[in-house]
Each structure stands twice: as C-alpha cells, then as structure tokens.
C-alpha cells in the first residue's frame, strides 16, 4: 500500500513537471498564439462584464461585485477594461448607470426619489450628485430640457 502511494505520488509529480515543461516550451516557441489567446479571453470576459453590468446596474455599482461574479480580481478587470475600452471599470459602470438614469428621466414620469430608489441610491440627493458629476446638470434640468 505504501509502495503504491509512492508510485502515485511520483506519477503525479512527473505529470506536473511535464505540464511545466510544455508550458515553458509553448511560451518560448509560440508567444503570439498565447498572446492572441489572452486577448480573446480578455474580450470574452469584457463581454461578460458588460452583460452582467446591463443586467445589474440598477442594483450594484461596485467593481468588486462584477469581478467576483466573473471569478477574477478587480485588478484583472481593470486591466481588461483598460485594454478593450481605455477606461476603468468604474468609469464604464458609472457611464452605463448615467445613461440608464437619462432613459428613466426621459421615458418615465417617475419622481427623482423613485428613480434613486430604483438605482439603489441612498436618497435622491446622492442620485442628483452622481448625475451632476456625470452630465454636468441636475436630473430636473435634464428632464426639463
């Protein structure tokens, strides 16, 4: 039994070493293939980020939430967004939320307070501050134009 455990351990170790050797050979001999694969993965993750964002932007505006849902770190999400969009994840989130709020202001009769509640702001003053920072105007001014 002990001899079999040693054989299994040795086999695992050899397989692990083989994978390390293959990885280093691939990186040395085919760097462009690996770079393209990383680009494709980044684009795929960015697409998933955008899908999650559109579904959840009414409730959640934190970068960590989206990174967790994608099973990546906030730093890696930042790197992906920067490569694909040349913007941070927070800038993308805020931009999507601001555009959604614009839609609500244009297409509904909901009060600012109700829109703030819909987008999970503490109260209407937080929404107004956010909206002014993003657009340069108050929600009421935007609605009235």
What is the meaning of each model-derived region?
Residues 64, 75, 111-114, 124-125, ...:
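Residues within helix-turn-helix
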Residues 129-145:
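…primarily DNA-binding HTH/wHTH and HhH modules…
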Residues 77-78, 126-127, 131:
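Short hydrophobic/aromatic patch on the recognition helix
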Residues 2-14:
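All-alpha amphipathic helical-bundle segments outside canonical DNA-binding/catalytic cores
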Residues 60-90, 95:
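Charge-rich, low-complexity intrinsically disordered segments
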Residues 1-5, 21-31, 48-62, 81, ...:
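Basic, amphipathic alpha-helical hairpins
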Residues 83-122, 144-145:
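Terminal helix-turn-helix DNA-binding modules in bacterial transcription factors
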């Amino acid at each position: 039994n002990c001899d079999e455990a040693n054989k299994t351990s040795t086999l695992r170790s050899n397989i692990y070493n083989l994978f390390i050797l293959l990885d280093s050979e691939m990186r040395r001999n085919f760097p462009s293939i690996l770079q393209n694969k990383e680009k494709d993965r980044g684009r795929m993750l960015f697409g998933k980020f955008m899908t999650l964002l559109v579904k959840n932007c009414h409730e959640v505006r934190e970068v960590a939430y989206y990174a967790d849902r994608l099973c990546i770190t906030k730093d890696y999400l930042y790197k992906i967004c920067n490569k694909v969009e040349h913007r941070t994840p927070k800038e993308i989130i805020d931009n999507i939320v601001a555009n959604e709020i614009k839609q609500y202001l244009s297409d509904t009769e909901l009060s600012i307070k109700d829109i703030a509640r819909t987008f999970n702001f503490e109260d209407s003053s937080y929404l107004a501050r956010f909206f002014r920072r993003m657009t340069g105007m108050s929600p009421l001014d935007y609605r009235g134009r």
